Amino acid sequence: MRIALGIQYDGAAFCGWQAQPHGKTVQDRLEHALAEFARVPLHTTVAGRTDTGVHGLGQVVHFDTDLEREVFSWVRGTNAFLPSTVSVQWAKPMPDTFHARFSAFERTYYYALYVHPVRSPMLAGRAGWIHTPLDDDAMRAAAAHLIGEHDFSSFRSSECQSKTPVKHLYQIDVRRAGHFIHFRFRANAFLHHMVRNLMGCLVAVGRGRYPADWLADVLAGRDRNLAAPTFMADGLYLAHVGYPAEFAVPPAQLGSVPWSSVWADLDPQT
């Protein structure tokens, strides 16, 4: 039997998703909890491996098991062995044709950026921060150069294991709400550090360091050295993974973040 799980986690508490020998990753803790509940080792396959500090609101995994359990018991039972920084949100039996990674046709990330002269300790690990004003319109104009199917090598980390740098970026939204600017990135898939590298460039344009069309030159150059430094991970959230309707994957629950009303207006599942 194949079971899919919806996972939420506070990325600030972990060294990324992927299992490591030190055991301080989300995958390590999740698989430990599953093994405690099931009394047998279970290996999970994830929709997208997030980096250290990146949060998960709509992460999806699957695993295979011969065990017979009431479906919701996978939620309740696994959560009993998880720390407060990770939670299984739902469980659903799936056909063998479902694959958490390869069945997904799109991913949506949000970035919450606090724009204020003084940093807030209450937002540590939850939102990015910049102390200088930003030009929203300039960032929107810059983002427009990135929409479409392109070679995103300029925004790819040296550790990226993707077979191709060509991705289709469907949407970048920039929305201001008080002292926050919220960014939404939707694509068929993302390269390692791609969203954080895009953020670094958009913020550089917003600060007036470069004109909006600079980003078109960076994209065309296909050279990571042309782009701005990688932006901080603190405000980055994997919000949604899109699957074909036949799998009826439950929607991500965004209400667990304080700016969920702003994100709801942007609607990550359209």
From Swiss-Prot:
Signal peptide: none annotated. It catalyses: uridine(38/39/40) in tRNA = pseudouridine(38/39/40) in tRNA. This is tRNA pseudouridine synthase A. It comes from Burkholderia cenocepacia (strain HI2424). Formation of pseudouridine at positions 38, 39 and 40 in the anticodon stem and loop of transfer RNAs. Its EC number is 5.4.99.12. It is an enzyme of class 5 (isomerase). Keywords: Isomerase, tRNA processing. The active site is at D51. It comes from the Bacteria. Homodimer.
